[in-house]
Amino acid sequence: MKAGFLCLVLCAAVAPSAHAQMTWTDKAFVNITGGAQAGSHTVATSATFDLYDEQGTLSSSQKVGSGGLFDLSGGYKVRKNLAAGIGYSWSGSKADASITALVPHPIFTDQPRNVSGSVADLKHTENTIHLFAAWMVPVTDKIDVGISAGPSIFIVSQDLPTALTVTEPGPTVNQITTDKSSKTTVGINIGFDVAYMLNKRWGVGGLARYTWGSVDLKNASDKLTVGGFQIGAGLRLRLQ
């Protein structure tokens, strides 16, 4: 991931100077992209629940991994090769969580028992608004490159285990309750987009972009890193 981010930075630094003499002649662009977001982060939580008139504790750990990506973005020419743009992206994945809990005793007070288990298919989604400035570089009459950077607004939703019920004697885990934790945070984006035009209006292209942010989820022991390295391909529209 670090290598991909470094590549984006180098491309952003080199490409504008290498083609500074070429002016982008279109007025606006629209990009529609499908792909994947890479990355793997761990979210650990600790929550309390009531059972048998006492308080138990529930700890969980799960991986937030790679997922699918949809991106829709557009920009308008401000001056020469510079465009201002806005985009929306969605990324989502599912993962299992392992849990451990201290469960109160049904008869004796202050005699908690250890139980463990797992819960499947906890959803993680990121709806993100990207604001960016893009430097558009015509390479040939059919190929252009866009190098962009700016802030991103992440709207993050994560399923988290919050409580459980047990079967006695044992105890044996009967059901694990989950809750959706939603947070909004601001991060960054830096991207590199290549378009090959089939005619004056329509073409195909590829996107490589790095996004980053972090959120404090309910009951989480540490901040969760969101975003990551994104790659995809799709349709490219140019407006004259």
Residue ranges and their predicted role:
Residues 20-78, 84, 230, 236-240:
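Short glycine/proline- and aromatic-enriched beta-strand/turn motifs that initiate or cap beta-hairpins
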Residues 62-87, 121-138, 183:
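Outer-membrane beta-barrel transmembrane strands
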Residues 140-146, 160:
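Short, structured loop/turn "capping" segments at alpha-beta junctions
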Residues 1-26, 240:
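Cleavable N-terminal export/targeting peptides
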Residues 81-84, 143, 196, 200-204:
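Repeated loop/turn-to-beta-strand initiation elements of outer-membrane beta-barrel proteins
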Residues 28-30, 68-72, 127-131, 153, ...:
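Hydrophobic, lipid-facing positions within transmembrane beta-strands of outer-membrane proteins
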Residues 32-38, 86-90, 147-155, 194, ...:
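Transmembrane beta-barrel strands of outer-membrane/channel proteins
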Residues 39-65, 89-128, 154-185, 213-230:
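Extracellular/periplasm-exposed beta-strand and loop segments of Gram-negative cell-envelope proteins
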